[in-house]
Structure formats: structure tokens, C-alpha cells
Amino acid sequence: LFNGKRLSIFTTAENEKSFEVTFTKQPDQLLIFWQNMELPLSLYTWEKGRLTVLVPAEAALLERSFIRVIAAAQGVISNDLLIPLHFDKVLNHIKELKRSDKEAQVLYSLMIDRFSNGDKNNDRPLNRLDVLPAVDFQGGDFQGIIDKIKSGFFNDLGINTIWMTPIAQNPETPWGYDEVVKTRFSAYHGYWPIHPTVLNEHFGTEDKLHELLDVAHTNDINVIVDYVANHLHKESPILKEHPDWATSMITDDGRPNVRLFDEYRLTTWFDTFLPTLDMEKREVREAMTDSAVYWLQKYDFDGFRHDAAKHIHESYWRLLTKKIRKNPKWNHLYQIGETYGSPSLIRSYVKTGQLDGQFDFNVYHSAVNVFGLAEGDMRELNDDLLCSLDSYGYHNLMGYISGNHDKPRFISVAGGAVSLKEDTKLAGRVRTITVGDSTSYDKLAALEAFMLTIPGVPCIYQGDEYGVPGANDPDNRRMMQFDGYCNRERAHLDKVKKLINLRRTSLPLIYGDVMPLYCDKDIIAFIRIYMGKIAIVACSRSNETKRVELSLPLAFKGNDLKNNFNCNFRTLGDSVSITLPAYGFEVLMN
């Protein structure tokens, strides 16, 4: 698992104003930083293979600051440690966390039009014969979200950050055409902006949006909004005034520059009616970053989810983040992007002066194959996870999803109701997609257990908490259901609530260092460690009961562990044996 090369470091104890670090092998180099400034030698000691670090007195001036530790041995670099401080003490109580603590977020992704209809007075479906109901407006709005916050829906689930789809003005007429089912498409989703600073009246008024944010914050919930900077709809008055702001729809060799996402990454159009903006032009960057900042100035948002991040020039991200950081009130903002590509491409946008994180689709795709398909191999997921940790850091702010509005529902893939080898969009347009085999609920729970316990920011896509089925767009965007669940759906919802509660209340699962413990074709196990507290996670993709034997790292014994999901386990010294049911998982904690 370690290939004999990994140097792992982890925190083993804390005493308010100091903490200890243990190493799996002797390092020959140490780097210790507080707020990205190297700590003086007087604040740490190295003795008998153990590092003791003192909290600097200056930390008392900041409610939240961080110490980072990294080591190396014979050219092999360790995992990085992130130690949060609460003023001049090591953070050691959940009650010291705030909603501005980015590592402590659990996101909930919702599509406004498909979430909850709280005000039928603003319902304005196109009601056209050439637009099927599945791709027309269905009435979800700001009032619906407000109602669900007030009802306790999000707090009961354990969510502390809501990600809403775009709220800017979109066209009132349908666009595109599907030849198979004979339909055009409304802009119910919000991703075809006409004007990036005009509110979409389908969702509510400016006052109602202010109310939504006030109610969310009163309930200790962040709200981040989806912002589309890559393109404008061809009917945009901005493009009519500045046609030169768009990239060419024709490539140099005469082909249509449409959906050439990798070949012409920075210039390709998403559709013939969605011109891509030329961000290499300074005036375009200024205008679109000003438009993004407008939403922060007018409304009290807590960050952005950025659409199509990899298709936008790096200079745009640097300019936007520079403008945001000029205002101290926005230091807490969380920016997460959407990029499909290699870890190196994704990482190029995740750095100082750009984005906090991006959604890690590579780990998600691997998890879908492993937990959802018979031919999956857990070792591939283990490799992809370690690659991501090495690429983005062991305390990254990447997004780890249960699904999203551009993917077929995992539960239907795992249940065999839809195949990844077919056109998953077409599947949902020509037949009714169900859950399929009922074991798919267990497989979805295992995937969600994995995503909610690894480092990063977990994200639940609306409906995945109870297991709504569906193919790809638009079938994966069915109207949200809040009651009338069947027994399997209720049981699944209870599991997800418990998993989210563990994530929200366990410092090892929020800030813990991570070490792999075991991996074979069917089982993966790892440990999260924070100041001597541990969480051991084991997940199985097998259709049979499996027992796994684990050896805990230095300094840990298993005699005070407790299970959370009723799996049988035994401990003897530093050894732990866990029996996992088919498609089962367990989280052991001390």
C-alpha cells in the first residue's frame, strides 16, 4: 500500500498551547509554518523521534489561524499536516468551529427550479407544445428554499453550506432541439446568462433573495451561488454591443468550434447559441469579474461555485480573487470550480490567488466504477485518492460529490437501470429509469460513506440523501421529494444523516491526518488522526460478508474503539478486525 516509500506524519497529542507529531520513519528535513511564515527554532523541539510544537503568542490576535508541518526523508516528502488554532490554543472542541471554517463544510447542491416551489405566483412555465415538461420551468424558487431552511430540513440533514444554481437572467424563449423526443429546452437551470447582473425573476425578487440569505445565516448555514463567466447567451445585450468579446465559432482549419472541450479548451463554445467570452482581453476580464463582485456587494453570499472553470483563462481567476481579497469582509469566501481533466490541469487553478478548490471528478468517476459496477477494483480508487492527496494536499478544499446535475444518478447506475455504456441522456428520455436492483441503496450508502470521510469538502446532490433514481440530464433533475419515502428511502436517509453528523462532529474527520491501512480488490480502509483521536473507515464493494484485519500505526491501540454502523469488530493491541456485510461500511472511533 505504501510501496515502502511513504513517510507519514500525524498528530498524537495536544496540550492547549502545544501539540506533538509522530513519524512512521525518521525524517531528515522539517518545515513548520504558522500563517505561511516559518516558525523559529525556539518554538519546536525534536527529541526521540517526536516533534513538539508550541503555538506562537501572536496567534492570540486571530480567532482562526493555522500551523502547517511537512517532512522529508531521503527525498520522499510526507503528507502535510494542518493544525487549526482557536486564538492561541490548538482547536480541540467542535463548538469552536464556525460556518466560515471551510474544512468543516458539508455542501448541499440544489437546482433552484427543481428544489421547492414556495411561491406559485412567480410560476411562469413556457407552456409550449415544443417544450416537454421535463425541460420546462417547474416552479422552484427562493421562497421554497426559505421554507425548507425554516422547517429545519437542512439542519436536520446536517448541511451547513448550500450551493445554488445560477440566479442571473436567462432567455425567456427555448433553445436547442432534441430530434429523438422532439423538444426544445427552456433555461430553467440558469446556465445560459443573458445579463450576468440582473436577477432571474423566475426565482423571486431581490428582497426575497436577501431574506433567503438572512434566514440561512440565522440558521448557521452558508450559501454559495453558481456564477457563469465562460459564456453569455447569444441574445445578451452585452454581446450585441460588444460582438468582439466572443471567441470565434470557427477553428483555424474551418471546423465549427463547438464542444471541442479539450482541443480548444479556452475558446470552444458549449453550443451554437452560447458564445464563449475571450478572457484574454482585459476589458472582458474586467467586466466579468466586476459582475461577479456585484453579487457579493449587493448580497451577502459566502462564495462561488464557478461553472466551466477550465475553459476560462487563468488571468481571469487571478483578477477575480484579487478583487475579492481587497475587501476584508470577504476573507471567508469559498471558491470552488468545475474542471474535468487531469490532476495537473485541475491543480493549475487551485493555488494562492485563484480558487480554493475544484470538484474532484477523477475520484468520483473511480468511486462510481468501484462501488457501482461489478468489474470495479478498489485498488484503483485507492490509487486515485492518493494521487489527489499528493496533487492537492492532504487537507485540501476539493469537492467530493455523491453526484451532480450533469451525471446519471449513481443509484440507477449501481442498480443496473441505466448503463454507462449507453447514451445516459437518451436513456432518460425514452424510458422510465428506476432504482433497479435494491442493493443499489447499499452501494450508494457506501459511496457516500467514502466521500463523507475522506479529506476535502463533501457534497450531497439533492435527492441523493434518500436515493432518487434517474438517468442523465434532465432525468437527474427531477423535482425534489420531501416526504412519502418508501422504507428503503427512509433507511437510506437515516444512514446519510448519521454519516453527515459524524463528519460534522468529529475533528478527526474534519482536520484529521489520513493514512491508508488496507486495500484489496473489494475493501479499502484508512485512518483519520487528530491529536490522538482517531476514526477508522472501512468500505466494501463485495456482495459477500468480508472480514478485514487492520494494523494501527504507531502509538495507537484499538481497545477503546466504538462502532457506528453495527459491524462486528475485535481488537487486540494495535490490531483491529472488522466484519463488513455485503456493500457495507463502518466508522470506528475512540
Predicted regions: what is each one?
Residues 1-19, 25-108, 117, 138, ...:
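Carbohydrate-interacting/catalytic domains
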Residues 101, 105, 115-299, 319-329, ...:
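Substrate-binding/active-site clefts of carbohydrate-active enzymes
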Residues 106-108, 162-164, 223-225, 304, ...:
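Hydrophobic faces of well-ordered beta-strands that scaffold small-molecule active sites
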Residues 113-117, 168-170, 229-230, 302, ...:
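Short, solvent-exposed loop/turn segments at secondary-structure junctions
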Residues 122-140, 414-435:
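A solvent-exposed, charged loop/short amphipathic helix patch at secondary-structure junctions
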Residues 132-136, 278, 305-308, 431-441, ...:
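Active-site rim elements
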Residues 231, 291-293, 297-302, 308-401, ...:
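Active-site-proximal helices and loops of the catalytic beta/alpha 8
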Residues 383-425:
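Aromatic-lined glycan-binding groove of carbohydrate-active enzymes
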